Amino acid sequence: TYVNYRLWLGSNKKIIEKLEEKYNVKIDKSRKLEENVFVDIDEEFEWPDVNNNIYKTSGKCYGIRDHVGILVDGSVVPCCLDGNGSIKLGNIFESSLDSILNSKRALKMVEGFKNKKLEEELCKHCGFIEKINKN
């Protein structure tokens, strides 16, 4: 388990000051604050939402490959940006993580990302995917 504070550049001065005070460090870039606690300061991107104006069918992503999210109700989602559980792969209270990650839907997403194909509708509307595919 770890904590990652995600902050946008320029708009979180008070939060950064509080974190600097708590962890007794100067925060001017993304960094480790202590064991399993990080701060990520970056340019703002549009949060995934099927109702936004972003629409891409191709691109790479680190979701499900490098990390997953587990919501409070036990829903396993492919990334930390799916806070509403739009892409529920399974439930950790009902199935093992291994079986969830080896489900047909999860494997289809992994294969799609390998081939730079976005399989899920939410992924097609993700501003973070736009951001990482610029690099």
Where are these regions (language model features)?
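Residues immediately within or flanking Cys/His clusters that coordinate Zn2+
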Residues: S58, E120-C123
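Short Cys/His-rich metal-coordination motifs, predominantly Zn2+-binding knuckles/fingers
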Residues: C126
